[in-house]
A protein has these predicted regions:
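Active-site histidine-anchored catalytic micro-motif
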Residues: 1-137
Length: 137
């Protein structure tokens, strides 16, 4: 069985947001065994799996990414869409825009402390569209 759907995440402020619940509420029933691929259709945000318990992790991730790719650098040429745009593209490349997660017994087989993050790199990114492909039996 192969299923593919497109879902939309609600707009988020800039930062790292735990979206596991929002994502799961929009998914069909998962197969007993398989894999799920989640692909983000945007170039200024990303997806990641990281700690789901301590919100300080999300704050620290934002700090780390902002230090790695600062805004307002004079060497940036792509600046028409604002100071946060070119850094958002670079950060998206660093985090990636897709995740593949195993499905076991009809559930995402992630660690107890793992959650799915939307990494929003724009100040006002808007709703984000994800293509979800489920392969399983």
């Amino acid at each position: 069985m192969i299923q593919q759907i497109e879902i939309t995440l609600t707009p988020k402020s800039r930062g790292f947001h735990l979206v596991t619940g929002e994502l799961m509420r929009q998914l069909p029933k998962l197969p007993k065994t398989g894999v799920i691929n989640i692909f983000c259709k945007h170039t200024s945000c990303g997806l990641s799996i990281n700690e789901n318990a301590d919100p300080d992790v999300r704050t620290d991730m934002e700090t780390i990414f902002n230090r790695l790719v600062p805004e307002n650098r004079p060497e940036y040429e792509h600046t028409l869409e604002g100071a946060d745009d070119m850094p958002a593209h670079a950060k998206s490349t660093l985090s990636g825009v897709s995740l593949t997660i195993p499905i076991t017994d009809g559930r995402l087989n992630m660690g107890i402390w793992q959650g799915i993050y939307l990494c929003e790199y724009r100040n006002h990114g808007g709703a984000r569209k994800l293509v979800v492909t489920i392969i399983g039996e």
